[in-house]
Amino acid sequence: MQMKKALAWSKNNATVNILKMVGIQHFVDFAKKLGIVSDLHAFPSVCLGADAISVIEMMRAYTMFPNYGINPKPIYITRIEDRNGNLLENFVPERKEVINEVTAFKMIRMMMGTVLFGTGRRLKPAYGVEGECAGKTGTTNSESDAWFIGYTPQLLAGAWVGCDDRFIGEGLGEGARAAMPIWGLFFKRIQADNKLGYNAIDKFDKPSIMEGLDECDAVDEISLQRAAAQLNVTRGEDDMADPNDEPGETNKFDPADKGTEDNDYK
């Protein structure tokens, strides 16, 4: 299975196999490089969201994609002016390159699959989000944490729904059911406010170094439709199911579990 398809449909066996290839400690070290300051435990489940991480940390890590490899440190105040509009202080975030722009663009294209035909495919039709956007849903054991981190060429935002006590489940609290609607409504309001200067039809620019190259691994409608057929997907974690239905796919993984072997992911 291609990674773009596994990512779009949250097929976590693929994620675990990639972790095994790169190494758990390397994964943890790279996460720290992206601004994750919370404790990360070197277990296989670390790649599936087993550790508690704040929304701002996750958002900072994701900024490397729409910023084409650049990971800025979040700041809350950009400038200070006096009552007459004179600039007193200007603040510029620290910026560092963590991946190259080609890798970042490929990840953007892959993550667009989540919104086009993956677990987040209800985002555009349900909330009227226009233009290109990419993101990822996330759900932990017993649906105690629901995530959606998404971005457009101009703006990135994240939503988390859950409890301090992670043993409390939410029933239908999967990422696309509980967190993605918050993100969708937020962006819908941004699009409707002309004062913000938000361009809803803006597109992700292809790096100049890739011009003339065949973007064979880009996410497109046909490939994802084929992926859905191959996976026999009839319900995703975003389907608004009856409360009596069994919940959709979640990231159930025991920290002691070493994962499963599947030659299709190698």
How would you describe each model-predicted region?
Residues 209-266:
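Low-complexity, Gly/Ser/Thr/Pro-rich intrinsically disordered linker/tail segments
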Residues 21, 71, 75, 198-200, ...:
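Amphipathic repeat-derived elements
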